[in-house]
């Protein structure tokens, strides 16, 4: 049994929330708790940059031909926001976990302090922006301290942020620490793609072109396309389309917009084109 599961069940019980699934902020900035009481089939999902830690149940992620299993044995680190497909598997107990936002300033500070010791300088840069990291040893201990701090408001303020600092530090030192390290290396293709992704998520309503994004990334269109697909598992156009469709789905489900309103809200010039692509 996961050593995190009892703490997550305790947190779930403290919410007094009857919903079968949900997400809620915790007393630690940038840390949210999520739960799902039932299995869910493979479906599209948009993940922002962060760490996804599952202590009970399991998720299976699918991205560009790759498959990620994250559960009590491994967490998922996302150096860039990615739209991929996700499946939720539960046994007798609900899926429980936390999400930790990644603060760029925190990552930059750690890299500035420990760059030489990390051993990443001069090595080949990372390709994928999403990787699993084993939940064991010091990383598991730091996560346990974070969850324990949520029992008390003062602990959440004093101990929680320090535990988050250590979690990010431990991930940076892990087998896939480059996913975070390369975000701070501004001249790499990976960092350029990360900046392009920020632009796409900020301006997804606009008529963005690949040539424009490639120019801003100081790459040719073909080089940008290759680098983008290596990091996200999608071509730039596929990524932008999926992002718009997922944003539209959220607008339909949670904001009460109609189909035509949702289409124009996310940048489609034609509601009929949006309807065709949404049905696919």
Region roles according to the model:
Residues 135-138, 142, 163, 185-196, ...:
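N-terminal positioning helix adjacent to the helix-turn-helix/winged-helix DNA-binding module
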Residues 2-11, 110-166, 170-171, 196-198:
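Amphipathic alpha-helical segments enriched in hydrophobic/aromatic residues interleaved with Lys/Arg
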Residues 166, 170-175, 183, 201-243, ...:
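Basic/polar phosphate-binding segments, predominantly the helix-turn-helix DNA-binding elements
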Residues 145-156, 171-180, 195-209, 228, ...:
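Basic, amphipathic alpha-helical hairpins
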